[in-house]
Amino acid sequence: MDIIIIDNITKSYRETSGERFVVFKNFSLAIKKGEFVAITGESGSGKTTLMNIIGCIDDIDDGKIIIDGTDVTSLDEDELAKFRNQKIGYIFQNHYLLRGFNVLENVLIPSIIKGYFFEKEYIKKAEELLKTLGIGEKLHREITQISGGEKQRVAIARALINSPEIIVADEPTGNLDPKNSEIIFNLFYDLVKELGKTCIVATHNLNLAKKADRIIDLSPQEVRIRELSENSTY
């Protein structure tokens, strides 16, 4: 079953010159429930724009986007914000963790936004996620006192705390060295697969992308399916 349907969309931005730069024109893509999809492509090819569109952060000029049966292009701002908070978890290259908060508190922020103020259920879930990601012993460490790789693990746990159906990850290991990048990506991949989440990851690292069920390669002039990994069941 397709959980994400991007139907014939067009997306453009207005440049400082006043002209419009078209990122996508008549672009369509379907992603199955539980699929792990990697988005690759050179800088400027539209990876981040596509992540923002799927993540309901950015709007489109034309076309339709259906996520888990809902036409999100028909929702107003409040409806879209509620839908996004319920259905989608985000991981960004710049993790945007909050200074002055410890590891556990940073993970719990999405649940607090939903109105669950440090409820035992969410605290336990956060502790389990952090333990699975290898930093369970640093729950109460201030966020500035952990390494870059550990911060990215916190960002992964934060994205999963509300049990979203879909994870959108834009260059989630882009700021890490190759060794830590591979370690964190593998932890992330295994956890997402174990939880049965649908995941879309933008990455410039083809070695990491090869773990995906499917790789979508974006180029300035066209979008094409680059390859289907051997482990794909789709």
Locations of regions flagged by a protein language model:
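Conserved ABC transporter NBD signature motif
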Residues: G63-D71
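Catalytic Walker B motif of ABC-type/P-loop ATPase nucleotide-binding domains
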Residues: I167-D170
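Short coil-to-helix segment of the ABC ATPase nucleotide-binding domain corresponding to the Q-loop/switch region
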Residues: F101-P110
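Conserved ABC ATPase signature
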Residues: E142-I146, E150-Q152
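The feature captures the beta-strand-to-loop junction immediately N-terminal to the Walker
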Residues: T40-E42
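A short, proline-enriched helix->beta-strand linker immediately N-terminal to the Walker B motif
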Residues: I161-E165
